[in-house]
UniProtKB/Swiss-Prot annotation:
InterPro entries: Ribosomal_bL36 (IPR000473), Ribosomal_bL36_sp (IPR035977). HAMAP family: Ribosomal_bL36. The gene is rpmJ. The keyword Cytoplasm does not apply. It comes from Heliobacterium modesticaldum (strain ATCC 51547 / Ice1). GO terms for biological process: translation. This is Large ribosomal subunit protein bL36. Belongs to the bacterial ribosomal protein bL36 family.
């Protein structure tokens, strides 16, 4: 999980979602997981 000021999709399978008011990227590749913080 990477915490970044701006989250971007890295590959085609990355999805941007909102969880508890936080913007997150979920993906099949665990290295692509990000959240905004």
């Amino acid at each position: 999980m990477k915490v970044r000021p701006s989250v971007k999709t890295i590959c085609d399978k990355c999805k941007i979602i909102k969880r508890k008011g936080k913007v997150m990227v979920i993906c099949e590749n665990p290295k692509h997981k990000q959240k905004q913080g």
